[in-house]
């Protein structure tokens, strides 16, 4: 029997992931990152977001073979501030950093999966070939394979170099680099540049929008969308109701 795939977009302290995984613990579950730094207007405190991340880590430990945890720009900002300081919890930076470092072996930057005859690439924001070429000092662009990013990330010395490239931010997000990194790419970068990695369907989050999944040419799927999580009208803003994509 084929497993279901459950993809959890940007959490930011929301609780919708709990309903999504309940009863599906043996299915394939992939979190797209950004667990911390909640939106103030949603009524979620940094403390609540920290607790959700603790529980997500515990969920991963209970189901290590089925659950993949990817990191987003907000999470990585606690490991390297040059990557992101947006909405960062200044008071608890050291605590958040320690939680991530203590469990760093549980996290990846990218995940490559086979589904039928297709190869699907999961990441926080999507992978552009322009970003790879811009960082050819780090990546073997002629023989690149996505798993190379994780290999560098899990090497303590290599991680320092990777963090330099992960801090790349394009003009679409207020930066000056030719391309956003795999944790910073805005979906409009794909729309205007048509430089996604060939041979893959990519599924990512990062670019928040209302409605359902944002699909480009059937092979780029942005899931950081309003239909994935919706505040219950009768509850306070920390109560989240899971919706089907």
Spans of model-derived segments:
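Beta-strand-turn-beta hairpins that frame and shape the catalytic cleft
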Residues: 1-6, 113-121, 217-218
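A general structural motif
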Residues: 1-3, 24-28, 64-66, 118, ...
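Active-site neighborhood of phospho(di)ester-bond hydrolases with catalytic His/Asp-centered motifs
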Residues: 7-9, 29-33, 68-73, 122-123, ...
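Core catalytic region of metal-dependent phosphoesterases/phosphodiesterases
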Residues: 8, 13-102
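Active-site environment of divalent metal-dependent phosphoester hydrolases
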Residues: 13-16, 37-39, 74-80, 128-130, ...
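Active-site-proximal loop/helix segment associated with metal-binding centers of metalloenzymes
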Residues: 90-95, 114-195
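Conserved N-terminal structural segment that caps and organizes enzyme catalytic cores in eukaryotes
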Residues: 104-114
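Conserved beta-sheet core of the metallophosphoesterase superfamily
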Residues: 185-244
